[in-house]
Amino acid sequence: MKNTFDPLRIGDKSFSSRLMLGTGKYRTSEDAINSIKKSECDIVTVAIRRLPTNINSDNISFLKSLDWEKLWLLPNTAGSQTAEDAIRMAFLGHELACQLGQEDNFFVKLEVISDPKYLLPDPIGTLKAAEFLVKKGFTVLPYINADPMLALHLEDLGCATVMPLGSPIGSGQGLNNLANLQIIIENANIPVIVDAGIGAPSEATMAMELGADGVLLNTAVAQSKNPEQMAFAMNLGVQSGRLGYLAGRMEKKQYANPSSPVSQISKIY
């Protein structure tokens, strides 16, 4: 069940789900479609480089099966090795959004990755592309390493979110840099979406308990034994973590503290 009373706001849009789901690596298109439905996500990200921009192509027939009146497309620039390449992908992403009936959609998940082995984002290329796209009116969601200073620079440029990685893309290693993620979250005045590396619902919960505003994942669902079930589990994990964060964790204590009252108890002799 979505929490409509605690919306995620990105740019001028509000979303009831704080889970974003990718569309790659699924065994079948049916798995992708059913997982998206089961996750109850509002935002679906699509790698533009890996798709033709013609919505009538058979290669992206699964996109036509999704309800774009309920879902919001987040085109991503995955595969871009330079800022210039990412900028071109962003404009192609907007064209695809228009073909899906979302003419007002200028969202882009900005990825500039020049390293083919470790797939770590290029901070210089990301800054360069972000500055250009923000000036062109795009709602930019940059994928970055867990670098607190870079996050602040991107916020200053006008990015709508920052998306620090939990661990390398597709690794399933979970949250490897909790300290830096916490610093980014504490200092940001824009939403922080933890992106990449999450492999289990408990890790999605942990990200939300830290205070992240949302989680984006793909491989953890797509490559699980039961993608639909994992999508539902991730949905619950994100909601649980968010509610726990809002409720506030109890203070840790050095010594044990009884949970039952110890005063005003009659002694029985």
Curated annotation (Swiss-Prot):
Against InterPro entries, the record matches this protein to: Aldolase_TIM, Thiazole_synthase_ThiG, ThiG
A Gene Ontology cellular-component term: chloroplast
Q: What is this protein called?
A: Thiazole synthase
Q: Where in the cell is it found?
A: Plastid, Chloroplast
Which molecular function term from Gene Ontology is one that the record holds?
thiazole synthase activity
Source organism: Thalassiosira pseudonana (Marine diatom)
Q: How does it assemble?
A: Homotetramer. Forms heterodimers with either ThiH or ThiS.
Q: Does the keyword Transferase apply?
A: yes
The record lists the catalysed reaction(s) as: [ThiS sulfur-carrier protein]-C-terminal-Gly-aminoethanethioate + 2-iminoacetate + 1-deoxy-D-xylulose 5-phosphate = [ThiS sulfur-carrier protein]-C-terminal Gly-Gly + 2-[(2R,5Z)-2-carboxy-4-methylthiazol-5(2H)-ylidene]ethyl phosphate + 2 H2O + H(+)
Which family would the database say this protein is a member of? Belongs to the ThiG family.
